[in-house]
Amino acid sequence: MQVRIKFSKEGPMKFVGHLDTMRYFQKALRRAELPVAFSGGYSPHMIMSFAVPLGVGMESLGDYFDLEMAEDMPTAEIAARLEEQMAEGMHIVSVRKVEDGKAGKAMALVAAADYLVEFRPGKEPSIDWKSRVKEFLAQPEIKVTKQTKRSEKEIDLRPNIYKMEVRENGFFYMLASASSNYTKPEMVTNTFFHWIGEELPEFAFTVKRLEIGRAHV
């Protein structure tokens, strides 16, 4: 039995990195005494896979991991027992069974992610930036230099921006999130303001991931 677990990560837990989040859930699953399936071999480990890693300092209302169970049990019981082990800022949103024939690694199912970017108090630019978004998106290309592990390369951001909408105090984004074209909302935001001639101060805005999944544009 494979289940897909949706969880939120807010408050102090946003400073816990991806690898530590994985370890956190491994410990929580053991404390919950759930019948989790393990791999074979000399070093068995829980059979689980997480979706797109969340950056340190970013909150999320919709993150996922897939978990292989050694035996069937009600998803409501899995959710309740795991929720009892959650610390402040971490919450189990839902647990659902992955139907036979549709199982797969959570990461492989991700094509897009929704984000909310909001300016911190006193950090919103004083210039009229909201009226410039349509013009920014109308560009056939949005070239930026992306830093990789070994070098720099120029990429076109425009195909990776599925949605960019103005909110009262920031932006709503739907951005590409597959492993081949993962796009950070911070990069899009800073690129936009650089394009209109406004450089944002450090820590000008917060980022919250709302949901991940297939692109629904």
Give residue spans per PLM region.
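Core RNA-modification/binding signature centered on pseudouridine synthases
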Residues: K134-H216
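Extended, well-folded interaction surfaces typified by the phenylalanyl-tRNA synthetase beta subunit core
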Residues: K6-S8, P12, V16, D20
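Short, charge-patterned binding micro-sites
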Residues: A37-M69
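Short, low-order "capping/linker" segments at domain edges
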Residues: K102-P121, P159-K163, R214-H216
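Short beta-strand-to-loop capping motifs
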Residues: F7-K9, L67-M73, V117-K123, Y173-S177
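Ordered, amphipathic secondary-structure segments that act as subunit-interaction surfaces
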Residues: L61-L116
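Short amphipathic alpha-helices in soluble, non-transmembrane regions
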Residues: E77-M86, D128-L137, V188-T189
